[in-house]
Design a protein with these regions (language model features):
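The feature captures the beta-strand-to-loop junction immediately N-terminal to the Walker
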Residues: 77-79
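Conserved ABC ATPase "signature" C-loop
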Residues: 240-241
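Conserved ABC ATPase "signature" region
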Residues: 27-49, 109, 129, 141-158
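Conserved catalytic segment of ABC-fold P-loop ATPases
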Residues: 230-237
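Conserved H-loop
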Residues: 224-230
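Pre-NBD coupling/linker segments of ABC/ABC-like ATPases
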Residues: 2-63
């Protein structure tokens, strides 16, 4: 088994901004584009014009490379817009990188944006079992963790309510409880301390510390430098999509 839990190699993510939305082309339009497109591109190049696609893009990540070993606790820090959340979305396969590659070796539990991974029409109870099934757990395994998850999240009274009716704080509490208690080998957490009261934040830090002491890998995005210093062994600093 490899010693590397997470590897990013030359990772880049580009987004198109502005411009018209893409639509399906007719067969006639596709044939015309196939013939005329290269001719127009050569003409534009000779005139020194740039392609519109090149003008209207933004790189959220560019040439990001790092390794996280099994059992390490690593913080990801940087200003708003530095690319931290985009990095976790690429690592969790929510979005594909434009260039480079990301490698994850182990079962992943993650909490990204509020409600990510939950089906809004399903109840809290149903979403707990759905999340466990997605992680490859058997029902008996989830049963053993169920009470602990519910107690940590503090949503006992709302277990049979669809999560679309949960407040953002309730969704984050349940999402973190599911991610941290279903025995992930790798835990990816994005700004969980930005939502919830001080008591919940303290519980989250305590649970992440327990996960780390159990030999699991943790990648923790946060603006809370004190929390990163206390919890993490090292940190990755992102600035405008680049590792600094």
């Amino acid at each position: 088994m490899t010693d590397i839990a997470i590897r990013a190699e030359g990772l880049g993510k580009r987004y198109r901004i502005g411009g018209p939305q893409a639509r399906y082309k007719t067969l006639r339009e596709s044939l015309i584009e196939a013939v005329a497109g290269p001719v127009r591109a050569v003409g534009a190049a000779l005139r020194g014009e740039r392609n519109g696609a090149e003008r209207d893009v933004i790189w959220a990540l560019r040439d990001v490379s790092f390794d996280v070993r099994h059992g390490e606790v690593v913080g990801v820090i940087g200003r708003n817009g530095a690319g931290k959340s985009t990095l976790l979305k690429v690592l969790t396969r929510i979005t594909e990188p434009t260039e480079g590659y990301a490698e994850i070796n182990g079962r992943v539990g993650s909490l990204l944006e509020v409600g990510t991974g939950f089906h809004p029409e399903l109840t809290g109870r149903e979403n707990i079992y759905l999340s466990g099934a997605i992680l490859g757990m058997k029902k008996a395994e989830i049963d053993r963790k169920f009470d602990e998850i519910v107690d940590f999240a503090g949503v006992e009274k709302f277990l049979d309510t669809p999560v679309k009716h949960y407040s953002s704080g309730m969704q984050v509490r349940l999402g973190f409880a599911v991610a941290a208690h279903l025995d992930p080998e790798i835990l990816l957490i994005d700004e969980v301390l930005a939502v919830g009261d001080a008591e919940f934040q303290k519980k989250c830090l305590g649970k992440m510390s327990d996960v780390a002491k159990g030999g699991r890998t943790v990648l923790f995005v946060s603006h809370n430098m004190a929390a990163v210093e206390n919890l993490c062994q090292k940190a990755v600093m992102l600035d405008e999509g680049n590792v600094t």
